[in-house]
Amino acid sequence: MSHEGEEDLLEYSDNEQEIQVDATNINESAVDATVSETAEGATTDSEKKGSYVGIHSTGFKDFLLKPELARAIIDCGFEHPSEVQQHTIPQSIHGTDVLCQAKSGLGKTAVFVLSTLQQLDPVPGEVSVVVICNARELAYQIRNEYLRFSKYMPDVKTAVFYGGTPITKDAELLKNKETAPHIVVATPGRLKALVRDKLIDLSHVKNFVIDECDKVLEELDMRRDVQDIFRATPRDKQVMMFSATLSEEIRPICRRFLQNPLEIFVDDEAKLTLHGLQQYYIKLQENEKNRKLAQLLDDLEFNQVIIFVKSTKRANELTKLLNESNFPAITVHGNMKQAERIARYKAFKEFEKRICVSTDVFGRGIDIERINLAINYDLTTEADQYLHRVGRAGRFGTKGLAISFVSSPEDEEVLGKIQERFDVKIAEFPEEGIDPSTYLNN
């Protein structure tokens, strides 16, 4: 198959019928859940992937998961699934293909982690699960979720592969049956290199997952890597795709990798902003940003804060300034060596520092539960990226606060697009400040 042009895509079906599923009375959030069923050969596919119409569960115990998984879920303190988990897990554990859009913090990662672990029957030396994501930190985080939920499944081995590290170490791990993983979490470039050099065998893969699928598939080079990896896996497998944002343009591309998929869209496109997240802007001059930031860090109550800037240089300079001003801060950006980025991510996650200055490398999918304040020191240029940024605060249905600095006509234009795109009113931050109870959990 040629690699030239966007039409070089794997495609299983052109003729789909959408069936609306009643998703009312879940909670206060509106849920738009649709099931797409292939018209031709639907019976065969349904038998193969599992029948899913009308299946609903209200507690994790209702999913009838393996005892080892149920025990790990209890250890994590989870009892009731989120909207996306409630709609998706009952079908995904039976092998149904999934295309899922749900806003940040609703537990999409747990959907595919629990579903693949439920189906996993580990065989020494065989890779059964492949998870692809666009960022190294996200790959590391997903691996940790697998470790957390497989803690009572001692035979299950998980590995993470990403660029910036010696590929020889990956090869050594893969060729040894004692260390070879059953679950592989990887970025597309490194996994393609392992496939190309015949260092990994994907002929036994049963579950193929793409997290942040819009970001992975919208870039042609990354999409081509995914296609090459996809071709190295069996045709008969489960495919699941997840993202917080899923435009109408990218959905057909995603569907070409899927067979008879369950499609879940939690909240429609205009309501993707986070429940419980207070959002404000502050209009100021560029040279006023540092003073205003220091004032906010002094005045606001927060557990951890992430401050987004537009470049590596600004991240380094702002972090230096904050530390000199007695605001101990850590910085994370894409120009760091991989080991350093991971070490700093871990340090921030483990609460060694309360303030993190970052470029958009932390703008997608990163879960750090203590973050309840996000500040756009430099406002993003894209509305969708705004959602991913502010989604770092107020995750898992908790409260949070997002403040954006607006310092140019371009920023004002972007702010308008954000409000229009997500049908949300972002108010000006009051001079007297705000009540901490509006953005802090009790």
Swiss-Prot record:
The segment(s) forming the Helicase ATP-binding domain are: 89-264
The terms under GO molecular function for this entry are: ATP binding; ATP hydrolysis activity; RNA binding; RNA helicase activity
The alphabetized UniProt keywords are:
ATP-binding, Helicase, Hydrolase, mRNA processing, mRNA splicing, mRNA transport, Nucleotide-binding, Nucleus, RNA-binding, Spliceosome, Transport
What transmembrane ranges does the database entry give? none
One short Pfam family name for this protein?
DEAD
Query: So what does this thing catalyse?
Result: ATP + H2O = ADP + phosphate + H(+)
Give the record's GO biological process terms: mRNA processing; mRNA transport; RNA splicing
Domain note for this entry?
The Q motif is unique to and characteristic of the DEAD box family of RNA helicases and controls ATP binding and hydrolysis.
Q: Which family does it belong to?
A: Belongs to the DEAD box helicase family. DECD subfamily.
Q: What is this protein called?
A: ATP-dependent RNA helicase SUB2-2
**Naturally occurring in which organism (per UniProt):** Vanderwaltozyma polyspora (strain ATCC 22028 / DSM 70294 / BCRC 21397 / CBS 2163 / NBRC 10782 / NRRL Y-8283 / UCD 57-17) (Kluyveromyces polysporus)
